[in-house]
Amino acid sequence: MRHYEIVFIVHPDQSEQVPAMIERYKSTITSHGGQIHRVEDWGRRQLAYMIEKLAKAHYVCMNIECDQTTLDELEHAFKFNDAVLRHLIVKMKKAETGPSPMMKEVQREEAKKAAAAQPTEAQA
């Protein structure tokens, strides 16, 4: 089996459906004997360019190990899901299990928001 990194972008109006979508894709992978090494929900982020007149979208990254038939099934699911605006599947040499640079940035932003919220709570 080969290792892949999958990133897909979901319509921002469908953000609440993302956990269910992730579970559906994870069950597809594991039911065919594949493995999931990393799943990262990057949240709603600014797009580099407008897609379908949208400036923001919900990003999800998955690192998996599966065979070609499972990958074909996933790609088919991405193509025919109207909520998925774009998807990218990249073949990797080995499994990536650590946090991605994008996830580190998301964690940094959340830490800044938490630090900014604490002084206002202390003043109240």
Curated annotation (Swiss-Prot):
Compositionally biased intervals (Low complexity)? 114-124
Record-level GO cellular component terms = cytosolic small ribosomal subunit
A single Pfam family, by name? Ribosomal_S6
Enumerate the GO terms in the molecular function aspect.
Answer: small ribosomal subunit rRNA binding; structural constituent of ribosome
Keyword RNA-binding among UniProt keywords: yes
Q: Which UniProt keywords apply?
A: Ribonucleoprotein, Ribosomal protein, RNA-binding, rRNA-binding
InterPro entries, alphabetized:
Ribosomal_bS6, Ribosomal_bS6_sf, Ribosomal_S6_plastid/chlpt, Transl_elong_EF1B/ribsomal_bS6
- Which stretches does the entry tag as region Disordered? 96-124
Q: Name one GO biological process term.
A: translation
Q: Does the keyword GTP-binding apply?
A: no
Note the Gene3D superfamilies from the entry: 3.30.70.60
CDD domains in alphabetical order: bS6
| HAMAP family, per the entry | Ribosomal_bS6 (MF_00360)
Task: Name the NCBIfam families on file.
Answer: S6
As for family, the record states: Belongs to the bacterial ribosomal protein bS6 family.
What exactly does this protein do? Answer: Binds together with bS18 to 16S ribosomal RNA.
* Identification of the protein by name: Small ribosomal subunit protein bS6
Organism, by scientific name, is Burkholderia mallei (strain ATCC 23344)
